[in-house]
């Protein structure tokens, strides 16, 4: 049986480390810390990539962009997203919509959510209203609650591209 839709779910987390900003959804956000990561550590784009790859059973971001590969050292995660989008389109699929949740105490995501939505929609060549970015805290529980790191969850609906 063949379906015209696929659903994917992704998750990413990074610990805070030295730095003065974090990348979130392709947007540079000022913060008291950076993140510890091989690439730019954009948890939003990483979770989104995993959701896209998972929807078509294409593995995960670590398989496509392993941290052991120096090509991806300090890489812009927008490259990862565009690569994943290309894999989908080669197979006749595209993102219909994406719903992303950032989990952290700080930085505050709300003031940057529209810019993040615009960046993601632009990278995927989809409508702005097909991208949702929101944030929540963990009520000071766990590593995000203690301010030790940041996490993101993403869900995507893929649709077949009409021939």
UniProtKB/Swiss-Prot annotation:
Enzyme Commission number? 4.6.1.12
Assembly and partners? Homotrimer.
Does the record bear Lyase in its keywords?
Answer: yes
What cofactor does this protein call for?
Answer: a divalent metal cation
The family assignment reads: Belongs to the IspF family.
Q: List residue numbers at the site (Transition state stabilizer).
A: 38, 137
Q: What SUPFAM superfamilies does its record include?
A: IpsF-like
Q: Which domain of life is it from?
A: Bacteria
Native source species = Xanthomonas oryzae pv. oryzae (strain KACC10331 / KXO85)
- The protein in question is named 2-C-methyl-D-erythritol 2,4-cyclodiphosphate synthase
Residues involved in a divalent metal cation binding: 12, 14, 46
